[in-house]
Amino acid sequence: MNYFELFKFPPTFDIDTAVLADRYRELQRAVHPDKFANDTEQQRLLSVQRTAQVNDGYQTLKDPIRRAEHMLSLRGIDLSHETTTVKDTAFLMQQMEWREALEDIRESIDHQAIINELYDSFAAYRLKLTKLLAAQLSSGSDEDALLAADQVRKLKFMAKLQDELTRIEDALLD
């Protein structure tokens, strides 16, 4: 299913999330199972299916990584079950530095300084990747679509690093 069509958006990476939320509420009102309580069993089941599609579409378009994956899947590039790793040497080196910094947090006297520095570093790198991803997705070329897939892989890795940093921070606060 093309969620951009469902929510009446052009298939572009940059979308207005406030408009997305408004359209989500409109679609929810239109397909909500309560509206079909007195209809046939088939109509009620169809309503439940459509509600699930609307919910999944909203969650997909709301999240930049999932939105990019959806855009790529519409172009025949499915990243949902892949095990391809990032081959960018500079990114792999940066990844090792971040991993070492994560390991150093617990032994550090000033935990919060390292944590804040990592949050800032992650945010800056994600912003850079996201801008590059948006440009690659908008180009329309097959080569750029493959490059965009690499950016998505990197962003997924960044999300995992962010989660790991948050877990470490939470553990230190306990």
Swiss-Prot record:
Query: Keywords on this record?
Result: Chaperone
Its function, per the record, reads:
Co-chaperone involved in the maturation of iron-sulfur cluster-containing proteins. Seems to help targeting proteins to be folded toward HscA.
Task: List, alphabetically, the GO terms of the cellular component aspect.
Answer: iron-sulfur cluster transfer complex
InterPro entries in the record? DnaJ_domain, HscB, HscB_C_sf, HscB_oligo_C, J_dom_sf
Q: How does it assemble?
A: Interacts with HscA and stimulates its ATPase activity.
UniProt source species:
Shewanella oneidensis (strain ATCC 700550 / JCM 31522 / CIP 106686 / LMG 19005 / NCIMB 14063 / MR-1)
PANTHER family, alphabetically? Answer: IRON-SULFUR CLUSTER CO-CHAPERONE PROTEIN HSCB
| A family per Pfam | HSCB_C
Q: Which family does it belong to?
A: Belongs to the HscB family.
Q: Which GO terms describe its molecular function?
A: ATPase activator activity; protein-folding chaperone binding
Q: Provide the J domain boundaries.
A: 2-74
In Swiss-Prot or TrEMBL terms, this protein is called: Co-chaperone protein HscB homolog
Tell me, what is an example of a GO biological process annotation in this record?
protein folding
List the HAMAP family: HscB
